[in-house]
Regions:
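Conserved NAD(P)H cofactor-binding loop of Rossmann-fold oxidoreductase domains
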Residues: 91-95
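Conserved glycine-rich cofactor-binding loop
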Residues: 12, 19-21
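Conserved catalytic-site loops of classical short-chain dehydrogenases/reductases
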Residues: 85-86, 108
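Aromatic pocket-lining residues of Rossmann-like dinucleotide-binding sites
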Residues: 30
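Substrate-binding pocket helix/loop in short-chain dehydrogenase/reductase
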Residues: 98-99, 103-111
Length: 114
């Protein structure tokens, strides 16, 4: 990865949506660059897999199952941290439907999440 050229030793990164896709790739790249990680996803199984990869880089990894649209869950996670140097606010979702057909409650959720 390109971040390998950057030294992030003694830095802590929090990555939301870290269980899959771009969030997973970011978390792994940050670990490869030496950062310790706090990873958040809605799925424990995904967090376990990503955490295992991160630990291969000798980085500390703390994982939390969390719905980032739940303010209290996020607030509690943040309160437990000594420091956060890097934030990758990656969690997101979409509804595969033409925007004129999306239900109001679904649109509100997507806006809140993204």
């Amino acid at each position: 990865m390109y971040l390998k050229k950057i030294n992030l030793k003694n830095k802590t990164a929090l990555v939301t949506g870290a269980g899959k896709g771009i969030g997973k790739a970011c978390a792994i790249a940050l670990a490869e660059a030496g950062a310790d990680l706090i990873i958040i996803s809605r799925t424990q199984k995904d967090l376990n897999a990503v955490s295992k990869i991160i630990k291969k880089f000798k980085s500390k990894c703390t994982s939390y199952v969390c719905d980032v649209t739940n303010y209290n869950q996020i607030k509690n996670i943040i309160a437990k941290q000594k420091k956060i140097d890097i934030l990758v606010n990656n969690a997101g979702n979409n509804i595969p439907e033409h925007f004129t057909k999306v239900k109001k409650k679904d649109m509100e959720y997507i806006v809140k999440l993204n």
